[in-house]
From Swiss-Prot:
It comes from Methanosarcina mazei (strain ATCC BAA-159 / DSM 3647 / Goe1 / Go1 / JCM 11833 / OCM 88). PROSITE patterns: RIBOSOMAL_L18E (PS01106). Belongs to the eukaryotic ribosomal protein eL18 family. The gene is rpl18e. The keyword Ribosomal protein applies. InterPro entries: Ribosomal_eL18, Ribosomal_eL18/eL18-A/B/_CS, Ribosomal_eL18_arc, Ribosomal_uL15/eL18, Ribosomal_uL15/eL18_sf, Ribosomal_uL15_CS. This is Large ribosomal subunit protein eL18. The keyword Ribonucleoprotein applies.
Amino acid sequence: MGKKSLVKLTRKTNPRIVSLILTLKDRANVDSAPIWKDIAKRLEAPSRNYAAVNISKINRHTAENDVLLVPGKVLGAGLLDHPVTVAAVTFSESAVEKITEAGGKCLSVEEIMEANPKGSGIRIFR
């Protein structure tokens, strides 16, 4: 790991994010999956630049049974009328309710990384 990466990690105060970034980078190298390296790079940025995606945007831009990854937080504004699998760093309580009511699943980034090591078929939402 380069010196620049270590500086970015030491600025993070949330130990979960630090370990997630390291795990993502390791998985990107082991599985030759550039999606995990991209997500790690996005999470190294300041948290004020993390994605904040509403349910309404997910509803507009996805089809039934899509798998998406949000490098940030999923918020509960809007309605969801089809099942989707959403992985994110964090979810609001109302977002979890709406996704599960529509028949979808809420996963952490670690869980989707274990389920799909190559990252194929995953859409990144910003």
